Amino acid sequence: MDKKNRKPHQLIDDIYSIGCWITGSKEDAAELIEKTYLIIDPEATEIDVFKTFRHCLLDSLKGISCIPKPSCNDMEKLGYKLIKQDAEMKLTVLLAEISGLSPEIISKIMGNSVKEVNYWLSTGRTRFSSDLLLLNGRSKKSR
C-alpha cells in the first residue's frame, strides 16, 4: 500500500502496532485506537490522525509517575515528565520505523524541530536495540 496520503481507516494497523510497542499491552493499544478514532474526523489527514493518537497517548499517561510515593509535587511532575519523554522518544522511532514517516512529517506530528526529531531517532533507536539485546540475554539465560 502506498504510504502517502493514507486515510484514517488505513492507519489502524500502524497505530495498533505503535500502541502495542509503547504500552506493552494489546488491551491498552486497542483502547488508544478507540479513543483516537472517536475524536478524529473520518476525512482527517494522516498527520492529524497521528497528532490525535499522540494526544490520546500522552493523556493516558497523566497521573502516572516513575517515582513511587513522591514526597513533593515537584518530584511527581518530574516523574511524569520522564515518562512522557520516554513515550515521545518511542513514538518518534515507531512513527519512522512502522509508518515510514520522514523526520519532517514526524516533527509536525510531535511539534518539535526536525533537528530534535533526528536526535530522538538516533537516541531512541540505540535505546530500543539495547533494550532488545537485554531482553534476548535474559530469555537465553532462563532456558
Write out the residue ranges for each language-model feature.
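A short, charge-rich alpha-helical start-of-domain segment used by transcription regulators
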Residues: 1-17, 41, 45-46, 90
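Conserved RNAP core-binding helix
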Residues: 26-43
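Hydrophobic recognition helices of helix-based DNA-binding modules
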Residues: 40, 57-65, 128, 132
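Arg/Lys-rich amphipathic alpha helix in sigma70-family domain 2
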Residues: 46-72
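Short amphipathic alpha-helical boundary/capping segments
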Residues: 68, 76-86, 108
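Short amphipathic alpha helix immediately N-terminal
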Residues: 84-105, 109
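DNA-recognition helix of helix-turn-helix
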Residues: 110-143
